[in-house]
Amino acid sequence: MKKYEIMYILRPNLDNKYVKKINDTLQNVFLQAPNQILEQKEIGLKDLTYFIDNHKKGYYNWLMVKADNDAVLEFNRIVKITEEIIRFIVIKDKE
């Protein structure tokens, strides 16, 4: 298993319940054994440097996880089909 740093940005026009639902869905991918979430931060609503899909703000979320390749592939699949996510990045740690 490898360590990954993940950042994703949600559309700013979502209500808090829906933001929590999306966060829970994405985090559940890494809560199945043997994967684990090492750290997580809901950074909140921040200004974007440039417009993304006509949005100037977005809800930022950050995760540090230890996961196998299947979990990362599943995370990528979910993120790509979720329209509320406007950007994401997954970076493999140097460990």
Curated annotation (Swiss-Prot):
The lineage of its organism: Bacteria, Bacillati, Mycoplasmatota, Mollicutes, Acholeplasmatales. One of its GO terms (molecular function) is structural constituent of ribosome. Binds together with bS18 to 16S ribosomal RNA. InterPro entries: Ribosomal_bS6, Ribosomal_bS6_sf, Ribosomal_S6_plastid/chlpt, Transl_elong_EF1B/ribsomal_bS6. Keywords: Ribonucleoprotein, Ribosomal protein, RNA-binding, rRNA-binding. Coiled coil: none annotated. Gene3D superfamilies: 3.30.70.60. This is Small ribosomal subunit protein bS6. It comes from the Bacteria. One of its GO terms (biological process) is translation. Belongs to the bacterial ribosomal protein bS6 family. It comes from Aster yellows witches'-broom phytoplasma (strain AYWB). GO terms for cellular component: ribonucleoprotein complex; ribosome. NCBIfam families: S6 (TIGR00166). The keyword Iron-sulfur does not apply.
